[in-house]
């Protein structure tokens, strides 16, 4: 976890809060349930509360949910991580990252 904090900083990617070390968790950008692995390229720092709330939802869905509630997730860091994953040696990382990156950069659909 310390290497992750040194690489990305101590702030949660979802809420921006700097949690106590015991509340820091490794956030799988591509969740394990969607083929993600516990590799440095697929990991960002998140507080325990945000990691639990997100569960295994896709990045774009959780970003939109947070923004609708007034949150400010670090979309730049998420895009950068997803872009890096599109070049992964792991096919499932590449495919899911490309799909999530497209959805994250697409304009939000107006409510119907």
Regions found by a protein language model. Name each.
Residues 35-53:
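Short beta-strand-alpha-helix junction that forms the catalytic/metal-binding core
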């Amino acid at each position: 976890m310390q290497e992750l904090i040194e690489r990305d900083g101590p702030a949660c990617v979802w809420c921006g809060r700097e949690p106590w070390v015991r509340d820091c968790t490794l956030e799988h950008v591509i969740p394990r349930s969607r083929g993600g692995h516990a590799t440095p390229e697929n990991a960002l720092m998140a507080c325990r509360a945000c990691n639990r709330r997100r569960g295994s939802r896709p990045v774009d869905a959780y970003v939109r949910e947070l923004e609708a509630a007034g949150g400010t997730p670090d979309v730049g860091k998420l895009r950068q991580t997803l872009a890096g994953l599109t070049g992964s040696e792991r096919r499932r990382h590449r495919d899911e990252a490309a799909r999530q990156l497209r959805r994250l950069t697409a304009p939000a659909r107006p409510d119907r």
